[in-house]
Design a protein with these regions (language model features):
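Bacterial N-terminal signal peptides
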Residues: 8-18
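Conserved beta-propeller blade signature
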Residues: 92-94, 167-170, 219-223, 275-279, ...
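Asp-box/WD-like beta-propeller blade repeats and closely related beta-sheet repeat scaffolds
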Residues: 144-167, 172-214
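Short loop/turn segments immediately following the C-termini of beta-strands
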Residues: 90, 98-100, 173-175, 181, ...
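Surface loop/turn motifs at the tips and blade-to-blade linkers of beta-strand repeat domains
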Residues: 76-78, 149-155, 195-203, 256-260, ...
Length: 442
């Protein structure tokens, strides 16, 4: 090993250790949440704040804590980085087992190497992606008789899944593929057909691609994240990214439905208003309390700021050159979910049979922070809706993902409502699918 390499490695280690050992700050404030958040002033530093919860999966009988009136149980353990969930009409549960794909041009230099160390510390990228969808068939509805089948394999970092008629669509990191499905199938043996290409490439900074169908089954909507933290790779690298695509199923044509959304991940329809809601993971390195992640009803043709501004028209001067005309167009989102919470999973309560106050609203899977001194997220929350709009502050549904030492025993991501009306939670550090149901004893 050369002297320069040794010096670089030593500097890298020092930066990482200094960053992850920073002291505590005030806890996340209520002002970071809700329809009218109070935004803190931006803070910048040479070394970004890194306070990463070390991945240490659940041991023994340990499990998350469910809210009063509910209980948590195991649907399946021993999965390989389960990220996303989809429930078929017959009640079968599909789990996308997926992790970061190779991205040779992403996160280069010392900063990039630190980011990769952070990801591994947090439990991502420690092994090749499983690249498969697993089917869970819960025969008794209690998780005591669960069959497990490899439903579809040979994929490429899959996340989004949706069934339209007898066609099953999967959003890989670089394309949507489709296969035929028959009710009751436990394994798809035919080779998936490529339906439409998605932005991938050697940077592919935000690699997950989420997917939902329109209620009439004529359109697909795809969440495509940005190719950077805050535009540092140039605006050309963001072409058709930081956006929700609309795809016409019949023709295969697509358009950008809404953009300026840094990393739109969860997608869910709000039936009362008919609006498509999205959960958005916002940018880093502007301070512990800025900017908040959010969920919003996306409007056709709307622009939400990225990379020029955040939370409406708050200018991010790191983006050069700036574009005042685009900033002027930027609209503020509907509901703040807290800074650096990594609010990824999104699920409408639908036919949920959980007790009040978890009846009419959105469930949000908060994967957890790495870029603030006091950790935020690492929980599933519920936001009540009234007349199609979110009201009040989030309510914790499932917590306890951090142990007493601050290690991450699990990290919640994808969410779904099962056929029994319980909430399913994918935990990609605990390698478990959890079920939150009403507690009959309360």
């Amino acid at each position: 090993m050369s002297l320069s390499t040794k010096l670089c490695c030593g500097l890298l280690t020092a930066v990482f250790l200094a960053a992850v050992s920073r002291g505590a700050d005030d806890s996340p404030a209520a002002s970071e949440y809700g329809p009218s958040p109070v935004l803190a002033p931006p803070e910048k530093s040479l070394i970004p704040t890194l306070h990463v919860a070390k991945a240490k999966p659940w041991e023994g009988d340990a499990m998350p804590h469910a809210a009063r009136g509910t209980r948590v149980s195991v649907v399946a353990r021993g999965l390989r980085h389960p990220r996303w969930l989809y429930v078929l009409p017959n009640g079968d549960i599909l789990v996308a087992e997926s992790d970061t794909p190779p991205k040779p041009d992403d996160a280069r230099g010392i900063r990039g190497k630190v980011q990769k160390l952070v990801q591994k510390h947090a439990g991502s990228g420690t092994q090749p992606s499983a690249n498969q969808i697993t089917l869970l068939r819960d025969r008794d509805g209690r998780g005591e008789q669960v069959e497990r089948h490899v439903f579809l394999s040979g994929l490429n970092s899959p996340i989004g899944m949706v069934l339209v008629g007898d066609t099953f669509y999967v959003a890989n990191t670089d394309a949507i593929v489709k296969v035929r499905y028959k009710t009751g199938d436990t394994q798809i043996r035919e080779e998936p057909i490529r339906f439409i290409a998605l932005p991938g490439g050697p940077i592919n900074h935000h690699w997950t691609k989420s997917l939902v169908a329109s209620p009439d089954g004529k359109k697909l909507y795809v969440g495509v994240g940005s190719n950077s933290n805050a535009g540092e790779n140039g605006i050309d690298a963001e072409k058709e990214r930081n956006a929700v695509w609309e795809i016409d199923i019949a023709s295969g044509s697509h358009r950008v439905f809404a953009n300026g959304l840094r990393n739109p991940v969860g997608l869910a329809w709000q039936p009362e208003s008919g609006a498509l809601w999205v959960s958005v993971n916002e940018r880093d390195e502007l301070g512990d309390h800025l900017p908040p992640d959010y969920m919003t009803a996306i409007r056709e043709g709307a622009f939400y700021g990225f990379p020029y501004s955040y939370y409406g028209q708050h200018v991010d001067d790191r983006m050069k050159p700036q574009n005042p005309a685009m900033v002027e167009k930027a609209i503020a989102p509907d509901y703040a979910l807290g800074a650096h919470t990594a609010s990824l999973g999104l699920c409408w309560s639908g036919n949920s049979k959980l007790p009040a106050p978890f009846r009419s609203g959105m469930f949000v899977g908060q994967h957890g922070s790495w870029n603030r001194r006091t950790r935020s997220g690492y929980k599933v929350v519920f936001v009540a809706f009234d007349h199609g709009q979110p009201r009040g502050l989030p309510i914790e549904v499932l917590g306890g993902f951090l142990n007493d030492k601050g290690d991450a025993q699990g990290r919640p991501v994808g969410l779904a409502i099962d056929k029994q009306g319980s909430l399913l939670v994918a935990d990609d550090v605990g390698n478990t699918v959890w079920r939150v149901s009403a507690d009959p004893n309360q």
